[in-house]
């Protein structure tokens, strides 16, 4: 097939020991073989890759009659050099058609992506060390939960009642604490007061955030998947307040709490679903939530927290480079980070913290006592030893304030 680029390539081959190859698509200087075409430039290769990966459909406004190659050339000695070209800014439909006409293969795009993924995975730990550490810690958290919550193999999830939630979060507190130690070694070096402050800010925020994320991952927008493997049915919130032994009778509070659960759904679940947040993005946001504590107990750690957050952002950008599916990684990063304010609205940074303990749990059995084992934390635990009814009533009041706007 006759093309201007092939003429240029033939002339260059005959006139120089080091010929300059020209792109068969746009006649700019080529840099190698791309997707089956012997000579193509990076710009045309990138254009073809994006079109194929995103299944873009371009339309020509001139019924496929665009004069695609509108280049002017200057003869310099025995070399022909393009002075200007507006080929790349012309009709995308005709440009894509030219790519196919010159031999670019759609199947080569996916094959190249797989090879790229394997190559980048070799240096994955070096490329995103913070996020990989977070993921390993999170995988350990998931494994630990099977034992902590006495989950049987292949046990079907069920909708839980309000009275069951305290035990779930009581057991979960120990697992989350271990997760923090594994994910952030810096956490273990903090003073006890600072550890507690960070844990207060993180625990319930993470539980709500993770429940929403898991609901999105399971394509179930009307449920909150809780750590035990069961769920809260947002579509039938009235069932959340009844069980075999007791019916919760404070109807006004029930309705308020049901509204707040729906607010959590709209403020956290919907944005996560809209952006189709993946596991690394979820862990990055979780890390930032922890590190944006209002605690000022240790100013030195606040400086360290800024560095860790910066490294999380760098890792996330490298993650986008690895998966190679977004045209603009910076735009994707901005879209994901824009979810944070919605999460922070629902997960207030107030000093109020929900302590869930039943009256049957002794101080020595409390997860906080097992974790911290000092007088201040023992006092913290003792203050939470109330009757189950009182705890449940406080839970309603807390949630109403917790997610109020």
Curated annotation (Swiss-Prot):
DNA-binding residue intervals: 20-111
Cleavable signal peptide: none
Pfam families: Hormone_recep, zf-C4
Keyword Zinc-finger: yes
A GO term from the CC aspect: nucleus
GO terms classed as biological process: regulation of transcription by RNA polymerase II
Keyword match Secreted: no
Subcellular location, record wording: Nucleus
This protein's UniProt keywords: DNA-binding, Metal-binding, Nucleus, Receptor, Transcription, Transcription regulation, Zinc, Zinc-finger
Domain NR LBD: 126-376
Zinc finger extent (NR C4-type): 23-44, 60-94
Gene Ontology MF terms: DNA-binding transcription factor activity; sequence-specific DNA binding; zinc ion binding
UniProt superkingdom: Eukaryota
Protein role: Orphan nuclear receptor.
Family statement drawn from the similarity comment of this UniProt entry: Belongs to the nuclear hormone receptor family.
Protein name: Nuclear hormone receptor family member nhr-199
Gene name of this polypeptide: nhr-199
């Amino acid at each position: 097939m006759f093309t201007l680029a092939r003429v240029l390539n033939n002339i260059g081959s005959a006139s120089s020991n080091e010929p300059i190859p020209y792109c068969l698509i746009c006649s700019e200087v080529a840099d190698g073989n791309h997707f089956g075409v012997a000579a193509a430039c990076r710009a045309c290769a990138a254009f073809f890759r994006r079109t194929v990966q995103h299944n873009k459909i371009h339309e020509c406004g001139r019924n496929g009659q665009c004069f695609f190659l509108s280049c002017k050339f200057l003869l310099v000695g025995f070399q022909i050099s393009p002075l200007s070209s507006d080929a790349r800014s012309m009709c995308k439909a005709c440009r894509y058609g030219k790519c196919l006409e010159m031999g670019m293969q759609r199947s080569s795009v996916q094959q190249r992506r797989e090879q790229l993924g394997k190559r980048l995975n070799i240096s994955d730990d070096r490329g995103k060390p913070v996020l990989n550490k977070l993921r390993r810690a999170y995988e350990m958290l998931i494994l630990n939960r099977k034992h902590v919550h006495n989950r049987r193999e292949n046990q079907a999830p069920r909708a839980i009642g309000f009275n069951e939630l305290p035990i779930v979060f009581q057991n979960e507190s120990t697992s989350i604490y271990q997760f923090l130690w594994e994910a952030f070694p810096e956490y273990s070096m903090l003073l006890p007061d600072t550890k507690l402050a960070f844990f207060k800010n993180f625990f319930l925020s993470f539980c709500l955030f993770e429940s929403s994320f898991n609901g999105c991952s399971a394509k179930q927008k009307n449920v909150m998947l809780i750590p035990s493997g069961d769920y809260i049915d947002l579509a039938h919130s009235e069932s959340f307040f009844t069980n075999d032994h007791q019916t919760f009778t404070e109807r006004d509070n029930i309705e308020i709490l049901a509204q707040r659960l729906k607010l959590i759904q709209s403020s956290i679940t919907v944005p996560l679903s809209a952006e189709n947040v993946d596991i690394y993005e979820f862990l990055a946001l979780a890390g930032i939530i922890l590190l944006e504590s209002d605690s000022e107990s240790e100013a030195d750690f606040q400086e360290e927290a800024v560095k860790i957050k910066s490294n999380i952002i760098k890792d996330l950008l490298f993650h986008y480079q690895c998966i190679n599916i977004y045209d603009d990684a910076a735009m994707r990063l901005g879209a994901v980070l824009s979810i944070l304010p919605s999460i922070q609205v629902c997960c207030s940074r107030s000093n109020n913290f929900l302590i869930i303990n039943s009256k049957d749990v002794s101080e020595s059995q409390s997860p906080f006592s097992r974790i911290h084992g000092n007088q201040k934390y023992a006092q913290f635990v003792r203050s939470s030893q109330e009757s189950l009814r009182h705890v449940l009533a406080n839970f309603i009041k807390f949630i109403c304030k917790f997610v109020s706007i």
